[in-house]
Design a protein with these regions (language model features):
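Hydrophobic helical h-region of N-terminal Sec-dependent signal peptides
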Residues: 10-18
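Bacterial N-terminal signal peptides that target proteins for export
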Residues: 2-11
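Buried hydrophobic residues that stabilize the cores of well-folded domains
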Residues: 26-276
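Initiator methionine at the very start of the polypeptide chain
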Residues: 1-2, 32
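C-terminal motif of bacterial Sec signal peptides marking the signal peptidase cleavage site
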Residues: 20-23
Length: 276
């Protein structure tokens, strides 16, 4: 099992490293999908910040101008994991996230990267009867060795997610410590327009993990994954002390009611252009 694991990890790293050699100059010309809801690029005040590549309507890569890339990997047409390649002038920095189905409604998510390839951070995603992510548990930090998997540190938190069963959009996320004390609660509000990634195919169990992993982000490259039906307009957070803060997003739309420009009250005058 160990040999297979390390073989898989190294094979993935070498593969995406090879891809990176051909990707660094891809941003010179944005390749438009021509499909509303499948973004081709994000621009910050007119400057390219990320470009997107697809296989059909399945997202396959997010490329940054510096060469850093996030690769969405598939096996037999099914999403299987994420690989990261570093900026073009950086040798270290390859990483990976593997998704393994462990039960009818559970997935194990294992993530790690260089330089400590034998160390994994592991979470479990549990789905409800509608196939929507309901709970994400950080189970701990593990080291893979000759004797299998050894736990180095116990997980210390979990999150409960609430989705609208009709729109399948995230409405609430509550993060607790392992004694079930509430650490922070997030609530989410949306517009009524078509979502900026609404024609992009991504599994809900990936999206649930993504929302948990990037809950503190306001970078649109990560936040846009909330826009699978409509578009996020407000995220409110409340911590265990009762302190409340919020982030708001506004948009300009094209003739088909898809967002083409995004604004955030935390971006200090920056506007993000969305190209399809």
């Amino acid at each position: 099992i160990m040999n297979k694991l390390f073989s898989t990890i190294m094979s993935g790293i070498l593969t995406v490293a090879g891809l990176a050699l051909f990707s660094c100059s891809d941003n010179d010309d944005i390749k438009l999908t021509g499909i509303d809801g499948c973004p081709s690029a994000l621009l910050s005040n007119g400057q390219l910040t990320a470009s997107f590549t697809y296989d059909g309507n399945k997202l396959s890569r997010i490329q940054d101008p510096d060469g850093h890339a996030t690769h969405f990997n598939y096996e037999n047409g099914e999403f299987s994991g994420i690989s990261y390649t570093p900026p073009k002038d950086v040798a270290d920095g390859h990483g990976w996230v593997g998704f393994t189905k462990t039960g009818d409604n559970t997935f194990e998510v294992s993530r790690g990267g260089e330089p400590a390839l034998d160390i994994s951070y592991v979470e479990e995603v549990e789905l409800d009867t509608n196939g929507l992510p309901a709970k994400i548990t950080f189970t701990g930090i593990y080291r893979w060795g000759a004797n299998g998997k050894e736990q180095l540190e116990e997980g210390d938190r979990y999150a409960l997610l609430s989705f609208d069963p009709a729109t399948r959009q995230l409405l609430k996320q509550e993060v607790f410590d392992k004694e079930s004390n509430l650490l922070v609660k997030y609530t989410y509000e949306y517009d009524n327009a078509s979502g900026s990634i609404s024609h992009t195919e991504l599994p809900m169990w990936l999206l649930g993990w993504w929302y948990y992993q990037y809950s503190n982000q306001n970078d649109f490259k990560y936040i846009q994954f909330l826009n699978r039906r409509n578009n996020i307009t407000k995220i409110t957070s409340e911590n265990s002390e009762g302190d409340i803060s919020s982030v708001t997003y506004t948009y300009k739309y094209n003739e088909n009611n898809f967002p083409v420009t995004a604004f955030c009250d935390k971006w200090e005058g920056t506007e993000v252009g969305i190209r399809y």
